[in-house]
């Protein structure tokens, strides 16, 4: 089975403190979330966590977009 990095690790590649992009802002904020499930890959588990704990995420649509990008990258 091929190695698949965690969503958090992928998300950290999207950080950009100077960007106004929503995914970059999500990544910037997630970096400071000490309880973010850093080893998780599962969409449902991540979604549940974010819905309950991520007040810094203005819309779950941003997570959905970021997760689709993550899935696309993991296919290669």
From Swiss-Prot:
InterPro entries noted in UniProt: UPF0346, YozE_SAM-like, YozE_SAM-like_sf
Cysteine-cysteine disulfides: none
Signal peptide (from-to) = none
Tell me the protein family, please.
Belongs to the UPF0346 family.
User: Which HAMAP family would you find in this protein's record?
Assistant: UPF0346 (MF_01538)
| NCBIfam families in UniProt | PRK13672.1 (NF010193)
Kindly provide the name given to this protein in its UniProt entry: UPF0346 protein lhv_1069
Q: Which organism is it from?
A: Lactobacillus helveticus (strain DPC 4571)
């Amino acid at each position: 089975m091929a190695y698949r990095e965690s969503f958090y690790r992928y998300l950290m590649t999207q950080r950009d403190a100077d960007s106004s992009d929503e995914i970059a802002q999500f990544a910037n904020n997630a970096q400071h979330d000490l309880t973010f499930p850093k080893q998780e890959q599962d969409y449902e588990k991540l979604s549940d966590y974010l819905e309950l704990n991520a007040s810094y995420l203005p819309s779950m649509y941003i997570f959905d977009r970021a997760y689709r990008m993550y899935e696309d990258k993991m296919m290669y």
